[in-house]
Amino acid sequence: GRLFKITACVPSQTRIRTQRELQNTYFTKLVPYENWFREQQRIQKMGGKIVKVELATGKQGINTGLA
């Protein structure tokens, strides 16, 4: 199947001294095509947004049968 490589940004609250500051956390993950919409909704529910979406080439899967 196809894989998307997504970069998303979600707000994470960190305590800095006494004040609370909103800080964005960026993460990258590979998402199978079938799970794409679910992942998108999950990120949006967290108040985040998807910054970048790339089509990941399927080259990682070549050695799967050798494990």
Curated annotation (Swiss-Prot):
Residue ranges constituting the CpcD-like domain according to the UniProt record: 1-56
Single GO BP term: photosynthesis
InterPro entries from the UniProt entry: Allophyco_linker, Allophyco_linker_chain, CpcD-like_dom
PROSITE patterns: CPCD_LIKE
Superkingdom of the organism of origin: Bacteria
Main location: membrane
Any one GO cellular component localisation term in the record: phycobilisome
UniProt-listed Gene3D superfamilies: Allophycocyanin linker chain (domain)
Localization per record: Cellular thylakoid membrane
Keyword Thylakoid: yes
Family per similarity comment: Belongs to the phycobilisome linker protein family.
Function summary: Rod linker protein, associated with allophycocyanin. Linker polypeptides determine the state of aggregation and the location of the disk-shaped phycobiliprotein units within the phycobilisome and modulate their spectroscopic properties in order to mediate a directed and optimal energy transfer.
Protein's name in the database: Phycobilisome 7.8 kDa linker polypeptide, allophycocyanin-associated, core
Protein source organism: Mastigocladus laminosus
Gene, per the UniProt record: apcC
